[in-house]
Amino acid sequence: MFQLLSFLLSGEATAVERIITDACPVYAPFFGAMGVTAALVFTVMGAAYGTAKASVGISNMGVMKPDLVIKAFIPVIFAGVIAIYGLIICVILVGGIKPNANYTLMKSFTDLGAGLTVGLCGLAAGMAIGIVGDSGVRAFGQQPKLYVIMMLILIFSEALGLYGLIIGILLSSVSDTYCPGQALVPLNSGNVIGKN
């Protein structure tokens, strides 16, 4: 703050512009958009893997016991919820990206971190749901008493994605929208004036 004040008093508009550009660069929204992209891409990859892997087990089990297919469909639903976590954080992050307003580098990096957190946790959860769903459904087809155990393991696998969503929401709520000198307007002569 003292550095900004000394530049203001000296009238060096280029130095003030450099400080403003360092805090709120024009490329800051790129990192926020990458967070949105990472969240959706990774969670959808996890959901797709979980759905595909669990569906193979359901198909194999359904050949022998078609009456249990509806009950065995739960892992596919759990895998689909992972993609919804990614969609939730994407909507939150997109609402905070402001390319023409004050969007600091710190805020853009926390948005990127939020997107990566949700996305990678969703990818891991989707993989776990797929593997557990495939093996669990096959075991459930052989021994119906294993249904409760399969459900418990699926719930704990789903919780991995939920942990990522919670941390992603906390990261996205970081509110650093102050750009130094945001109320300053450089004049053509190189002088700097105060508030508009």
Curated annotation (Swiss-Prot):
Which superkingdom is the protein from? Eukaryota
**Topological domain spans for side Cytoplasmic:** 47-72, 133-150
Q: Name one GO biological process term.
A: calcium ion transport
Q: Which GO terms describe its cellular component?
A: contractile vacuolar membrane; membrane; proton-transporting V-type ATPase, V0 domain; vacuolar proton-transporting V-type ATPase complex
Q: Which residues cross the membrane?
A: 26-46, 73-93, 112-132, 151-171
The positions annotated as site (Essential for proton translocation) read: E158
What keywords appear on the UniProt entry? Hydrogen ion transport, Ion transport, Membrane, Transmembrane, Transmembrane helix, Transport, Vacuole
Record's subcellular location: Vacuole membrane
Q: How does it sit in the membrane?
A: Multi-pass membrane protein
**Which ranges make up the Lumenal topological domains here?**
1-25, 94-111, 172-196
SUPFAM superfamilies xref list: F1F0 ATP synthase subunit C (SSF81333)
Database matches in InterPro entries: ATPase_proteolipid_c-like_dom, ATPase_proteolipid_csu, ATPase_proteolipid_su_C_euk, F/V-ATP_Csub_sf
The yes or no answer to whether the keyword Cell division is present is: no
Q: Name one Pfam family in it.
A: ATP-synt_C
Keyword Ion transport on this protein?
yes
GO molecular function annotation: proton-transporting ATPase activity, rotational mechanism
Function, in words: Proton-conducting pore forming subunit of the membrane integral V0 complex of vacuolar ATPase. V-ATPase is responsible for acidifying a variety of intracellular compartments in eukaryotic cells.
SUBUNIT field? V-ATPase is a heteromultimeric enzyme composed of a peripheral catalytic V1 complex (main components: subunits A, B, C, D, E, and F) attached to an integral membrane V0 proton pore complex (main component: the proteolipid protein; which is present as a hexamer that forms the proton-conducting pore).
Per the similarity annotation, which family is this?
A: Belongs to the V-ATPase proteolipid subunit family.
NCBIfam families, per this entry?
Answer: V_ATP_synt_C
PANTHER family in alphabetical order: V-TYPE PROTON ATPASE PROTEOLIPID SUBUNIT
Q: What is this protein called?
A: V-type proton ATPase proteolipid subunit
In its UniProt entry, the species of origin is given as Dictyostelium discoideum
* Gene that encodes it: vatP
